[in-house]
């Protein structure tokens, strides 16, 4: 394969001077390479030792992701509930419906969940079948990154990049959950692989395939997939061989493919009449386009929040925490700023090797400037550099809803530069070896800080520092030699790679030893006593070892047994306010309607529409605890109508005690249609700007009355929101929060 001898940069190139030499004509001297190794993609030789090692790295990733996978239960209960429903009917599968009756969908396109639902259909619905697709996707992403880096920078670089990627804790975490991030990660890495293929083969079809891969990433997690596209597109623009005008046309075509794939599901959904399909969760008008461009799309970047509408299961906020641990994690990203990704929640998940990645980028940039050549290495450097820069800046300063595990999207680019750094160090001159040694020293300091900040596994920091120190000494002792021999170079690079991966590997392996949160996946040693906090100080449960599942509250099992016995022709056995109340029942196979979607804020129901469902025999029972979702005022208004119109079911009827909040609306359709919808009742809960309960004493009593331990202090500090009893109590007590009987805007734990 020829990289520069057949065609010079065209004369109309607007990015690089037309007189830049080709790779074979350029001066080979640069900052850390004396001479520069030949820039030729290394062919893929099947059956070779390098191929076996690449597969071994991918296998390591798969083992890490799949080891004791069933201890994580069903992962994120919100998504697990939808997967159960998607196995029930192909209609639910197509739309990504939360419930088997297809009343409302998930608040994301179903791309990633199609894979999980297919797995559940083939292997049966179980913990393994739900979580295995993510494990496989993460392992495939590792393999593709290894190949992508190896083709341009050599076998050593590819293997080091793959190992660094596989052992990044957040990669292991998302690979062991049913969140869509592993599928997104595979999609964008595949797009980078296709982009690199397009640059080296000079075939535009690979660039079109890159657009398609990014499009599927959009179908998995909306616009976040677009964060990698500027880097990929710019890498092709500066390094591909066709004339500049053709390159631009190629990128326009790739963007068109991206748009076509991205909008395919949106078009299919929105062309179907609203009466014939489920409401699109997370939208303001029931349309898929609004989901993509609204709160869940552009709103995530601008800081927009969804309605904190009446609904159960949300996360109260605005209180000081009461925990005594020194290491706490804000699962919502913490304070914005340039150092955000080094905070407690993200630093030990993705930033272990940041100094090496930064120095490697600068070295690769210097190489490109010195060589003045448009080739595959320039494209690779720009592609991964743009990916890392755009993603880091957006994640550091985004004001919208943000979770720590989102940084998995940054991991492939950082790992690529670890591999690139290994290649440059292997072929480096004296100056390059000095820079490599300095980057190792910086990495050792960072790793010691990250380990000791957590307050456990302190020996890991010491061991990593010693190993890195030995590798630094090894590099320094070679300075007397102008060049490294091949054997000494590989030994130096290999020792350094092993040394810097000790700490992240320990964190990754530790993450497999105990159950992980389905809602907030991470990989780190189990922290005794609980060390995970939420904004406003809502204390965590059992720390990083918290049990599987999400915020699922749930319906009492005795109540569900009674409701099942009452079901005749009804499509839904009961309607509740939010997915957090419905998830456990949906996972068990019951058809429960979550009127307000994820957090109870979707406006899907009115008294008239409820009356129509009752007349059609599709719904009979309503659960009013926590109110029903909708825009401000409408949810609590519907709850008021149901309470005043339908017949209450005493808890003793189904073997419970206290107030059940269950109502029988059979035969009440006429009264429901005639009932006025009152405004939200704010007299008992005046406006509260900080999102806390207007009457903490009443909130504490409400929690106790609903079977939960009393929160301490001035808020719910120290409670475990993954405990179903706690979640049910929070749902029942939502009316004591400001804003008309609702959680404050953005307080419900957005996913």
Q: Residues of each region from the PLM?
A:
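Membrane-integral, polyisoprenol-dependent glycosyltransferases
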Residues: 2-435, 442-446, 510, 598
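Transmembrane helical bundles and short interhelical boundary loops of multi-pass, membrane-embedded
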Residues: 3, 428-529, 553
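Intrinsic low-complexity, intrinsically disordered segments
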Residues: 44-48, 321-347, 545-569, 691-698, ...
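Stable alpha-helical elements in mature extracytoplasmic
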Residues: 79, 111, 128, 191, ...
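Sec-exported extracytoplasmic/periplasmic mature domains
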Residues: 88, 120, 172, 514, ...
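Alpha-helical scaffolding within the catalytic cores
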Residues: 276, 284, 514, 604-613
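Short periplasmic/luminal acceptor-recognition loop of GT-C membrane glycosyltransferases, typified by
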Residues: 502-600, 615-641, 646-665
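Cell-envelope/extracellular polymer assembly enzymes that use nucleotide-activated donors
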Residues: 675, 679-751
């Amino acid at each position: 394969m020829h990289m520069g001898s057949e065609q010079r940069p065209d004369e109309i190139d607007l990015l690089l001077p037309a007189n830049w030499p080709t790779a074979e004509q350029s001066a080979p001297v640069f900052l850390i390479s004396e001479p520069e190794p030949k820039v030729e993609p290394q062919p893929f030789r099947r059956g070779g030792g390098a191929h076996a090692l690449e597969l071994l790295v991918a296998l390591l990733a798969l083992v890490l992701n799949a080891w004791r996978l069933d201890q994580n239960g069903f992962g994120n209960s919100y998504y697990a509930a939808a997967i159960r429903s998607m196995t029930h009917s192909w209609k639910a599968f197509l739309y990504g419906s939360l419930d088997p009756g297809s009343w409302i969908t998930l608040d994301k396109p179903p791309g990633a969940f199609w894979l999980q639902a297919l797995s559940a259909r083939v292997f049966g619905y179980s913990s393994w079948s739900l979580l295995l697709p993510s494990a496989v996707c993460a392992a495939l992403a590792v393999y593709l990154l290894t190949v992508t880096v190896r083709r341009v920078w050599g076998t050593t670089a590819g293997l080091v990049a793959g190992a660094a990627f596989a052992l990044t804790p957040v990669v292991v975490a998302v690979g062991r959950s049913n969140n869509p991030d592993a599928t997104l990660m595979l999609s964008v890495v595949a797009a980078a692989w296709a982009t690199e293929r397009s640059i080296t083969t000079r075939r535009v079809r690979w660039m079109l395939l890159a657009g398609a891969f990014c499009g599927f990433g959009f179908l998995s997690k909306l616009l976040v997939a677009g964060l990698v596209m500027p880097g990929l597109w710019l890498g092709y623009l500066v390094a591909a061989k066709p004339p500049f005008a053709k390159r631009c046309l190629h990128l326009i075509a790739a963007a068109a493919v991206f748009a076509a794939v991205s909008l395919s599901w949106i078009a299919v959904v929105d062309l179907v009449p609203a009466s014939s399909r489920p409401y699109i969760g997370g939208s303001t008008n029931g349309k898929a386009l609004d989901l993509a461009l609204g709160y869940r799309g552009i709103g995530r970047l601008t800081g927009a929040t969804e309605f904190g509408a009446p609904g159960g299961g949300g996360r109260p906020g605005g209180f000081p925490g009461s925990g005594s641990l020194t290491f706490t994690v804000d699962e919502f990203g913490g304070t914005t700023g340039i150092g955000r990704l080094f905070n407690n929640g993200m630093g030990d998940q993705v930033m272990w090797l940041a100094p090496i990645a930064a120095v490697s980028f600068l070295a690769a940039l210097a190489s490109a400037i010195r060589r003045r050549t448009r080739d595959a290495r320039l494209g690779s450097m720009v592609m991964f550099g743009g990916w890392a820069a755009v993603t880091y800046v957006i994640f550091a300063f985004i004001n919208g809803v943000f979770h720590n595990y989102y940084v998995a999207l940054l991991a492939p680019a950082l790992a690529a530069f670890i591999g690139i750094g290994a290649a440059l160090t292997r072929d480096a001159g004296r100056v390059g070896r000095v820079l490599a040694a300095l980057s190792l020293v910086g990495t050792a300091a960072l790793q010691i800080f990250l380990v000791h900040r957590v307050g456990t596994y302190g020996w890991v920091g010491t061991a990593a520092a010693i190993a890195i120190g030995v590798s630094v000494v090894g590099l320094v002792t070679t300075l007397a030699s102008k060049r490294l021999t091949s054997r000494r170079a590989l030994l130096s690079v290999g020792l350094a790679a092993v040394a810097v991966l000790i700490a992240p590997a320990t964190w990754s392996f530790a993450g497999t030893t105990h159950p992980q949160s389905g809602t907030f996946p991470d990989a780190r040693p189990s922290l005794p006593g609980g060390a995970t906090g939420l904004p406003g100080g809502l204390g965590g449960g059992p720390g990083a070892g918290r049990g599987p599942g999400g915020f699922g509250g749930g319906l009492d099992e005795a109540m569900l047994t009674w409701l099942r016995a009452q079901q005749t022709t009804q499509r839904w056995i009961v309607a509740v306010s939010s997915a957090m109340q419905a998830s456990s029942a949906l996972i068990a196979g019951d058809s429960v309607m979550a009127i307000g979607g994820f957090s109870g804020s979707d406006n899907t129901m009115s008294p008239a529409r409820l009356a129509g469902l009752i007349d059609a025999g599709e719904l009979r029972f309503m659960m009013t605890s926590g109110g029903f979702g909708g825009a401000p005022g409408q949810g609590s208004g519907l709850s008021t109508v149901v309470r005043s119109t339908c017949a209450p079911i005493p808890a003793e009827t189904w073997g419970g005690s206290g107030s059940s909040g269950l109502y029988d609306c059979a035969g009440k359709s006429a009264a429901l249609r005639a009932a006025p919808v009152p405004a939200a009742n704010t007299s008992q809960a005046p406006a509260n700007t900080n999102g806390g309960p207007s009457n903490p004493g009443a909130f504490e009593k409400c929690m106790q009355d609903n079977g939960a331990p009393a929160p301490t202090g001035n808020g719910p500090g120290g409670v475990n929101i993954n405990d179903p009893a706690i979640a049910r109590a929070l749902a029942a007590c939502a009316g004591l929060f400001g804003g008309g009987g609702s959680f404050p805007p953005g307080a419900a734990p957005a996913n």
